[in-house]
Every structure is written in structure tokens, then in C-alpha cells.
Amino acid sequence: MFPKNGSKVPEIRFAGFSGEWEQRKLGDVFKYEQPQRYIVNSTEYDDSYDVPVLTAGKSFILGYTNETIGVKNASPESPVLIFDDFTTSSHCVEFPFKVKSSAMKILTLNRESDNIHCAFNVLQNIGYVPVNHERHWISIFSEFNVLMPKTSDEQERIGSFFKKIENLINLQQRKAEKLKQFKQSMLHNMFV
């Protein structure tokens, strides 16, 4: 689905698309925002609160806050990426949120014609593994050359494809979590 090293044309492609992809720096694909104005004041989280507090790491949602000032207003119509500046992990966010720390960048697209879900998968496809505990976006990631489809139609098709797969994965993970909770409940009720 993405061109291999040295090639500008992917081996697997949706029907109706042809031609080379264009090489761009990630810093030209994305602009970044420092998250300081969205940092949560209190770490007294409660699941009954409305605003999720995010980290770009594996845990993603740390909890929920009742703070309503300084909320980043992402939405399905205006999604953003959060990029952990130290681990380089990232997530696509389509809902309002606050953040835990300044150790991330909030990424948005430079071009309105680009598709954020396609660009997110390009970012996810970078095979970089951090070796030092240092910030990575400005000095390293923004300088990476990546290949992007030239047309917004192809970007949309790729982004939509991977978003559907991600939605299915999330659905299955929620089902698995409910089954684990059911199992724990049954074990507790049967053996206590």
C-alpha cells in the first residue's frame, strides 16, 4: 500500500490510481502546536467527567476531567494527531481533549487537500526507533522525507481504508475487554 525503499510507486494500489507519489518532508505535511495551553491542572480524574485527558503513549486516555477551559476542540471534521516527542508514538484524535504533559506535539495538516488519516498512516509507517531520551519532532521527524499520494482522492481512499480497519480493531478490543470483565465477574461469583 506504501512505496518501498527507493520506489515512488506502491506495489499494491486501489484501482483507478496510477503515477508516482510525491516526496515531502514530514514538516511540510504537518504543522505542530505546543500543548501547554491544553495541559490539565488537576490529576483528580473521574470516569463521570466529560473531558478525556490524553497521552500520546500506549495508555492514550489517562482519565477524565471536569475542566472546561483550555480544551483542544478536535472532532471528526477537524481531527488532530498527538505525537509523543520522546517515544514517537502517535494517535489520531477526533474528540475534544486535554493533555497530561507538554511532552507531545499536536499535529495538523499544512494542506487542506491532504487527508489526515492517510498522513497518519504514513507517519505510522516510519521505521524509526528512538535510542536516546530526547525530543524527536523538530530535530528528527519533521526532517524525514516521506512519500504521499499526489491526489486528494487517493489519499482519501487510503485514509478511509485504514480508518475502517482501525475502527474494527477498536470494536474487537472493546468486545474482548467486556468478555474479560464478564469472566472476572463469573470467577468472583463462582469461587468466593
Where are these predicted regions, by residue range?
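Non-catalytic DNA-recognition/assembly elements of restriction-modification systems
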Residues: 13-37, 48-58
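Proline-centric
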Residues: 17, 104-110, 128-129, 139-156, ...
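C-terminal accessory/regulatory regions appended to core domains
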Residues: 28-31, 71, 76-82, 106, ...
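Non-catalytic beta-sheet/beta-sandwich ligand-binding modules that flank or precede catalytic cores
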Residues: 21, 25-26, 53-54, 72, ...
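Amphipathic alpha-helical coiled-coil/heptad-repeat segments
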Residues: 1-28, 148-192
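A short beta-sheet element
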Residues: 55-121, 128-142
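Short amphipathic alpha-helical segments embedded in low-complexity Lys/Glu-rich regions
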Residues: 15, 44-46, 136-140, 180
